[in-house]
């Protein structure tokens, strides 16, 4: 098992990991993992941990969840593409996809929980619009590791697992994803609770980066294009960082893939900022944010505070990859989802349908050429099949609050629950 250190992209200092989320020197940038293994070797390890050369862990958890890549036939034929590859993250046994939560967020959750257990003692807190929370609840249910999850009240039904999540404390808040993030941040001020960290967590980014690893290893070379629908944009950052490692590996080509990232109209703050080549997201990039969020097809793509302008964030990633961003309408996403289901034989997550719609537009407009090598990240799917095959336990909220609930009341309930894990 190879080791790693952490590095800061601002001051370039190297330091050891103690579940570190930021530069010890106070720099404002996304720290990265620097792995001892320059070339990746696949390990005989469960699921996503086969890529542990480039994951910030030394041990593994039992899982079958990993990204599965294959060359498209049905969708490629429908769009007139000769070299379209799909990385599928979700539940689809026929192709070997066993992310039972239905989302690529499992690829983040497993290494994040393992990293926490190896590097510190405490309980992890996750704020989510649904998919991330469900993935962490699934890992908790499988490993008995405690986790505190905060989601908007509208997402409570998305918190289901394949075995009872006895060690998950689920808090719902009336509001949206940003309200869940804000409450989660306050909960993390309590002793013994650690934020999962979002884009700042190298385990989350490098877990997501396994999508690019799986795709490149299946294709034998880096793609010309990498496509994904994004809310925070962390998946795009992860794809770029994985590509840097694959180029340094020396066996998969030297040309950086171009990133094409999509947001769901009408909530497209990063698209607006990027079109003007601004590092900062302004209030006018998300006018009437709550109304816009209520109109999207995929509300997991609605982060109001994405890691866009931070050093090493989405803006820098798009600059480094000569990348593009575009908005996709909900109507186009729904039609694209139907096309994907009929042509490939599995239902995509709404966010993945947004990505398919973006691909269709890019092909029609000539941005993507028919013979280019395309890696399409289907970030979730197989829910219909999962409902048939898998046990389902919907996690009932343990604490239900509004934005007006005094934090002292919430804090007391959280600390009472934590006593079971002291």
Swiss-Prot record:
- Transmembrane stretches in the record are none
Q: Give the metabolic or biological pathway.
A: Cofactor biosynthesis; coenzyme M biosynthesis
- Record flagged with keyword NADP: no
Which InterPro entries does the record cross-reference, listed alphabetically? Cysteate_synthase, TrpB-like_PALP, TrpB-like_PALP_sf
- What are the entry keywords? Coenzyme M biosynthesis, Pyridoxal phosphate, Transferase
Q: Does the keyword Transferase apply?
A: yes
UniProt-annotated binding residues for pyridoxal 5'-phosphate: 131, 379
- Residues found modified as N6-(pyridoxal phosphate)lysine: 105
A molecular-function term among this protein's GO annotations? cysteate synthase activity
E.C. designation(s) = 2.5.1.76
Kindly list the cofactors needed.
pyridoxal 5'-phosphate
Q: Which reaction does it catalyse?
A: O-phospho-L-serine + sulfite + H(+) = L-cysteate + phosphate
Gene3D superfamilies, sorted: 3.40.50.1100
- GO BP term (any one): coenzyme M biosynthetic process
Family, as annotated: Belongs to the threonine synthase family. Cysteate synthase subfamily.
What do we know about how this protein assembles, alone or with others? Homotrimer.
Function field:
Specifically catalyzes the beta-elimination of phosphate from L-phosphoserine and the beta-addition of sulfite to the dehydroalanine intermediate to produce L-cysteate.
Matching entries from HAMAP family are given as:
Cya_synthase
Listed name of the protein: Cysteate synthase
Q: List the source organism.
A: Methanospirillum hungatei JF-1 (strain ATCC 27890 / DSM 864 / NBRC 100397 / JF-1)
Taxonomic lineage is: Archaea, Methanobacteriati, Methanobacteriota, Stenosarchaea group, Methanomicrobia
């Amino acid at each position: 098992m190879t080791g790693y250190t952490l590095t800061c992209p601002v001051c370039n200092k190297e330091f050891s990991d103690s579940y570190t989320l930021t530069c010890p020197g106070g720099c404002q940038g996304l720290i990265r993992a620097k792995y001892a293994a320059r070339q990746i070797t696949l390990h005989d390890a469960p699921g996503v941990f086969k890529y542990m050369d480039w994951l910030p862990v030394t041990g593994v958890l039992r899982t079958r969840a990993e990204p599965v890549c294959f060359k498209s036939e049905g969708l490629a034929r429908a769009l007139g593409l000769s070299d379209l590859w799909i990385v599928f993250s979700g539940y689809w046994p026929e192709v070997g996809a066993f992310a039972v939560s239905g989302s690529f967020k499992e690829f983040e959750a497993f290494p994040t929980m393992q990293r926490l257990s190896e590097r510190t003692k405490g309980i992890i807190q996750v704020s989510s619009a649904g998919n991330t929370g469900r993935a962490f609840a699934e890992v908790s249910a499988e490993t008995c590791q405690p986790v505190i999850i905060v989601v908007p009240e509208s997402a409570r039904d998305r918190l289901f697992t394949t075995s009872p999540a006895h060690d998950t404390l689920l808090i719902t808040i009336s509001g949206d994803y940003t309200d869940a993030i804000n409450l989660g941040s306050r909960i993390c001020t309590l002793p013994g609770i650690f934020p999962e960290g979002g884009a700042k967590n190298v385990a989350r980014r490098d877990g997501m980066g396994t999508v690019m690893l799986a795709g490149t290893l299946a294709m034998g070379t880096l793609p010309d294009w990498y496509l994904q629908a994004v809310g925070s944009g962390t998946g795009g950052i992860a794809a770029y960082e994985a590509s840097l490692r694959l180029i340094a590996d020396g066996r998969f080509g030297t040309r950086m893939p171009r990133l094409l990232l999509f947001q769901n109209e009408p909530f497209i703050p990063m698209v607006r900022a990027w079109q003007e080549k601004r590092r900062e997201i302004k209030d006018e990039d998300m006018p009437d944010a709550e109304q816009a969020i209520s109109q999207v097809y995929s509300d997991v793509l609605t982060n109001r505070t994405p890691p866009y302008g931070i050093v090493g964030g989405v803006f820098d990633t798009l600059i480094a990859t000569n990348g593009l961003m575009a908005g996709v309408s909900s109507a186009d996403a729904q039609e694209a989802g139907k096309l994907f289901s009929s042509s490939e034989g599995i239902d995509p997550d709404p966010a993945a349908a947004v990505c398919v719609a973006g691909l269709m537009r890019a092909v029609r407009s000539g941005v993507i050429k028919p013979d280019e090598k395309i890696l399409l990240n289907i970030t979730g799917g197989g829910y219909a099949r999962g409902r048939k095959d898998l046990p389902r336990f919907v996690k009932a909220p343990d604490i239900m609050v509004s934005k007006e609930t005094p934090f002292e009341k919430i804090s007391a309930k959280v600390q009472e629950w934590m006593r079971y894990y002291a």
